[in-house]
Every structure is written in structure tokens, then in C-alpha cells.
């Protein structure tokens, strides 16, 4: 019974495709708008019909699931591209909030193991870790300078300070790589080493993402007032990365 119903739905969908093509060639409507709206509705209809019978993963096609996810992703990108500044703030705020939840999960795991396994820690050379913090602090100062230059539409100075901010990010990643190469323990040796690599490695990935954001915003910046200071979301993201590093410094090195 299930197979006959699915065969009938496939037959209906094939008929719908031919009806769509015939209507397209007979009416002569605008090509892009017509194809976009027609096939978007067809994909939604196709997935909804088949998901009625997809009660288990056995009857759910991977292709249908992929097409549905792709349609949602494309529509979300289009909505973001045509949204106002307040909507962009809300989207970016939720993105940063989700990142905070990710770091909070691993920090809570570290706290749980740290409190349940009291250990005697050796003295550390704190100055080396504070130097890494100074690098990110310098980057935050550059972000504040960039915001002032964006308000003044200073094209050359803004591009120069964005390049310096990228250089700061590379210096931080270089120092982090030196720390990994000189560490005397490995991932599987001890739980503290595992969480150290997870937290600092995840933070380094976010530094790379911040550098990519700066590159994107520097590409779209024209220096004629077309990009307002409230749209410089890369600065907000960089401050978020710095605050995470301060929390990790207090947690891993000073506590």
C-alpha cells in the first residue's frame, strides 16, 4: 500500500513538472522570477508530500532532505541580504550568543573535572601568557581606532588599520603555535591537557574567523560613508574573542 501511494505521488510530481514547463513556454513570463518562485514551491510541495510517508529514516530520502535544507538556507541568505540594520544586529547577536553557549559548555566541563579532581599545580611563567593577552588587547585598541576612522570616512587610514589588525591576528596564532609545540604533554595524557587543547584551539579558530570578517568588511568598505559604523560587526566579534581569551587566561593559567 505504501509503495503504491509513493508511485502515485511520483506520477503526480512528473505531471506537475510538465505543466510547469508548458506554462513557462506558453505565457512568456519573466524567466528568473518565474523559475525561482515555481521551483521553490515545487520543492516545498515535493518534500512535504514525501515526508508524510517518511515515518522512519528508512523511507526518508537523503536527496529530499538535502533539497529542503538547501532551500531554507538560500531563503535565509536572501532575507539577510535585504534586512535592515536592526535585524542584522539581532542575527549577529544570536550568533555571538550561540558561540558563548559553545564555550560555556567546555568551560563547565573543565570546572567539573577540576573541582572533582584536586591537583597540585606547579608554578607557571605567567608573563608569557600575559604577552599573548597584550597582543589581543592591542587588536581591540585598533578596532576602536577603526570605528572612529569609519565615522570620519577615512579610507586610507581605515584600510591601513585593518591590515594591522590582521597582522595582530597572525601574531597571536604564531604565539599559540609556539605554545603548542613547546608543551610537554599530549592530548591523551591527561584530562587537563585535553581541555587545554579544546579551549585554546577553539579560540584560535575564532581568531581566524575574526580575521576573515575583517577581510570581508575591508573589501566592502568604500570610504564614502556607504558603510556606517554600526555595520562594523567585525569589531564586535573581535571584542567577543578578546573577552573569551581573558576568561580562558584566568581559568587555565591564573586559577
Curated annotation (Swiss-Prot):
Primary place of residence?
mitochondrion
Q: In this record, what's one Pfam family?
A: COX3
User: Per the UniProt entry, what is one GO biological process?
Assistant: aerobic electron transport chain
Membrane-protein topology: Multi-pass membrane protein
Q: Name one GO cellular component term.
A: mitochondrial inner membrane
Which InterPro entries does UniProt cross-reference here? Cyt_c/ubiquinol_Oxase_su3 (IPR024791), Cyt_c_oxidase-like_su3 (IPR000298), Cyt_c_oxidase_su3-like_sf (IPR035973), Cyt_c_oxidase_su3_a-hlx (IPR013833)
Q: Example GO molecular function term?
A: cytochrome-c oxidase activity
Compartments (UniProt record): Mitochondrion inner membrane
Its EC top class is: translocase
The record's annotation in CDD domains points to: Heme_Cu_Oxidase_III_like (cd00386)
Instruction: List the catalysed reactions.
Output: 4 Fe(II)-[cytochrome c] + O2 + 8 H(+)(in) = 4 Fe(III)-[cytochrome c] + 2 H2O + 4 H(+)(out)
Q: Where are the transmembrane segments?
A: 12-32, 42-62, 91-111, 128-148, 155-175, 196-216, 234-254
Role according to the record: Component of the cytochrome c oxidase, the last enzyme in the mitochondrial electron transport chain which drives oxidative phosphorylation. The respiratory chain contains 3 multisubunit complexes succinate dehydrogenase (complex II, CII), ubiquinol-cytochrome c oxidoreductase (cytochrome b-c1 complex, complex III, CIII) and cytochrome c oxidase (complex IV, CIV), that cooperate to transfer electrons derived from NADH and succinate to molecular oxygen, creating an electrochemical gradient over the inner membrane that drives transmembrane transport and the ATP synthase.
State the family it belongs to. Belongs to the cytochrome c oxidase subunit 3 family.
The name this protein carries in UniProt is: Cytochrome c oxidase subunit 3
Q: Which organism is it from?
A: Theileria parva
The gene behind this protein is MT-CO3
